[in-house]
């Protein structure tokens, strides 16, 4: 009888791609396993449609894609970002139940588990109806996962109001970090006094019901954090199986990518600094101008992915920038050394020999991609857990330099502006430390470790084998 796993990813590009690529990995490693991925359409991230189409255009044997019915976006416009996904899965429960009912009644298939994104763990109620074991996928790193469990314990078991850490100079002793974590690096969502933190912390409480947590990381990158999670008897078994990446670039605009990569082909090796801040990584106009001035003054070649601002309540991400946001004459003055783009094929850019440094928002996927390609990073976090990721990269792991590590720009509401002089200085530091700098050496070493981890008998390879023993 065929064994089947059901995957339920959050419909945000980084979350979805990670789970689909993981499904492909599972299938490639176990010949008796099939995976069905249930995809919800999310009205903001237009990149999901392109990725979804690419999956359907190039089917993978034993991988089934089921698109769940689209839900009216008006239901979500006024919800804070953290509440969108738990609300979304609540509205999809009926459809998920129908799929699970059909699959569990099949005489040719044995459903061996439901693997849900950490933001979708409320779907466990449906899995329980069919006695299907549940597992969690964490698209964030082990360090953040440990912090979330720590805050959930403080909030629920020790009755400590974690929102009091906002604007505090407290340093927290978090089990998943070797260094004390200043409160300024805690994700904003945990600190909101409007009840948002309760929504998120309740998800981590439910995670404890799972039979295992699969994390997109690897032992050599986060040994301290992974060990701390394994030492906690109240946390399910941890399976680090990464780095899981979209190495083939499915869902990318090939025409735009060709133009961008063609420009890079004309640049000298390791000469270009690449700036990219993720799907929601946009800046107010005054900050855009400071970045432009800092780049121009640095004298370095650059490739800058610039996105228009998205406001709370908007329903679509825009992929193109407006020239009006840039200083007068900037594009003309820098035309020989720089290129400003909207959407960026990030993996292909980081893999290109012309790129010598990466200014990043420190989303976890971007962290893993930079490690995979041995690319030194300058941190500029924006939202979510990115401040904590930046802290981990700079302070814990020594794999990055900082432009800012505690910058916050939720829905472009930040009043803080990073000045051109600081941007210029940090870009020069990132690009001019040379091939023998300490950070470059460490990043190159971690690149090799990341590839060994995924190879036969590597740490992630072995961890996945242990997961199969549990599931099958």
Curated annotation (Swiss-Prot):
Residues passing through the membrane, by range: none
EC number per UniProt: 2.4.1.367
Pathway where this protein functions: Secondary metabolite biosynthesis; terpenoid biosynthesis
Keywords, sorted A to Z: Glycosyltransferase, Hydrolase, Isoprene biosynthesis, Transferase
Keyword Coiled coil appears in the UniProt entry: no
Inducing or repressing factors: Induced by A.niger mycelium-derived elicitor, thus improving ginsenosides production in adventitious roots culture.
Keyword Hydrolase (UniProt): yes
Gene3D superfamilies in the record: Glycogen Phosphorylase B (3.40.50.2000)
Effect of residue 338 to R: Loss of glycosylase activity toward protopanaxatriol (PPT)
Protein purpose: Component of the dammarane-type triterpene saponins (e.g. PPT-type ginsenosides or panaxosides) biosynthetic pathway. Glycosyltransferase that catalyzes the biosynthesis of ginsenoside Rh1 from protopanaxatriol (PPT) and the conversion of ginsenoside F1 to ginsenoside Rg1.
UniProt name for this protein: UDP-glycosyltransferase 100
Species per Swiss-Prot/TrEMBL record: Panax ginseng
